[in-house]
């Protein structure tokens, strides 16, 4: 069985202009990603500010991306919530719109136990019958999908991957022992750890920085797959990632997507833009990175 994708999937931002979703900017951004070797596009996830999007906006964004991508790469819809029934309904609608897969975060606030996680994810997968990427991000949910739970869920025919945002390599190794990596993919959810994640057998990354450097980030994966040492190749990307860590995602990345013309530098409350000085430093760091490519 082949994986859903290998390499770089982009956790897509949502462009706003005057607090409205800018569909034309969205199309421009997606075309840029497709032209620069993105291997998958993840819509309506954390980076998209999904908690601030209405159901209608989420569906319009997803349909726009699906129509534009036209099956060239997988489109994965973020449909997970902390309510199983609502997650099912959102996932069914995503399937009806043409999504290739869904991504499901662990329930938050009314968090459950591991047995509840199994029932939650299996109920959605059973109802929707579309490939599922589990999303483990304990820094945002205060809950983790334990390796034993991943093992159980990986046996489900529609649960095919894990987005692992733990930044914990012991966790990765424990999961690897318990799954068949030929049929179940492990994607990093942390751009800054991809060198070691790839070395330890990860199949790719669901990336924030790839919103602005998709080609360069995919080239890193391709080089590693070719057996090359990618530490030096990663260093300039690492410098840009350090600059992006000035604030909480997606606040910094939208300072760069807007710089490239993909909507205004706008976020919806409770998120706020960087201070002007931080925005200037981040954009200068991006310019330095791009200039270094051309030397």
Curated annotation (Swiss-Prot):
- Name the Gene Ontology biological process terms: diaminopimelate biosynthetic process; lysine biosynthetic process via diaminopimelate
Q: What is the reaction catalyzed?
A: L-aspartate 4-semialdehyde + pyruvate = (2S,4S)-4-hydroxy-2,3,4,5-tetrahydrodipicolinate + H2O + H(+)
* InterPro entries in UniProt: Aldolase_TIM, DapA, DapA-like, Schiff_base-form_aldolases_AS
Q: Name one GO molecular function term.
A: 4-hydroxy-tetrahydrodipicolinate synthase activity
UniProt: pyruvate binding residues: 47, 206
- Subcellular location(s) of the protein: Cytoplasm
Which is one Pfam family of this protein? DHDPS
Q: Where along the chain is the active site annotated? A: 135, 163
Key words of the record: Amino-acid biosynthesis, Cytoplasm, Diaminopimelate biosynthesis, Lyase, Lysine biosynthesis, Schiff base
| Activity regulation statement | Is not feedback inhibited by lysine.
Give a GO cellular-component term: cytosol
Q: Where is this site: Part of a proton relay during catalysis?
A: 46, 109
Pathway membership: Amino-acid biosynthesis; L-lysine biosynthesis via DAP pathway; (S)-tetrahydrodipicolinate from L-aspartate: step 3/4
Give the EC number(s) listed in the UniProt record. 4.3.3.7
Q: Its biological function? A: Catalyzes the condensation of (S)-aspartate-beta-semialdehyde [(S)-ASA] and pyruvate to 4-hydroxy-tetrahydrodipicolinate (HTPA).
Give the record's family classification: Belongs to the DapA family.
Quaternary arrangement and interactors, per the entry?
Homodimer.
Name of the protein in question: 4-hydroxy-tetrahydrodipicolinate synthase
Species in which this protein is naturally found: Staphylococcus aureus (strain COL)
Q: What is the lineage of its organism?
A: Bacteria, Bacillati, Bacillota, Bacilli, Bacillales
């Amino acid at each position: 069985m082949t994986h859903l994708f290998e390499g770089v999937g982009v956790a897509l931002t949502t462009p706003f202009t005057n607090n409205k979703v800018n569909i034309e900017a969205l199309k421009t951004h997606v075309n840029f990603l497709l032209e620069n070797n993105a291997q998958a596009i993840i819509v309506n996830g954390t980076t998209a500010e999904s908690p601030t999007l209405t159901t209608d906006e989420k569906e319009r964004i997803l349909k726009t991306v699906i129509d534009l991508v036209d099956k060239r790469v997988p489109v994965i819809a973020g449909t997970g919530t902390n309510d199983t029934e609502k997650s099912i309904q959102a996932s069914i609608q995503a399937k009806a719109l043409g999504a290739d897969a869904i991504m499901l975060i662990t329930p938050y606030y009314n968090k459950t136990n591991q047995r509840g996680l199994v029932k939650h994810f299996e109920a959605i997968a059973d109802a929707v019958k579309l490939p599922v990427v589990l999303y483990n991000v304990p820094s945002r949910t205060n809950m983790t999908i334990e390796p034993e739970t991943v093992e159980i869920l990986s046996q489900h025919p529609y649960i095919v991957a894990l987005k692992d945002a733990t930044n914990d390599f012991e966790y990765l190794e424990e999961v690897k022992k318990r799954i068949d990596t030929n049929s179940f993919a492990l994607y990093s959810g942390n751009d800054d750890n991809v060198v070691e994640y790839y070395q330890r057998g990860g199949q790719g990354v669901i990336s924030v920085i790839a919103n602005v450097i998709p080609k360069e980030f995919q080239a890193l994966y391709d080089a590693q797959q070719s057996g090359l040492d990618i530490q030096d190749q990663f260093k300039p990307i690492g410098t840009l990632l350090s600059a992006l860590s000035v604030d909480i995602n997606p606040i910094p990345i939208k300072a760069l997507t807007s710089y490239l013309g993909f909507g205004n530098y706008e976020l919806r409350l409770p998120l706020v833009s960087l201070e002007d000085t931080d925005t200037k430093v981040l954009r200068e760091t991006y310019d330095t990175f791009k200039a270094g490519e051309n030397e």
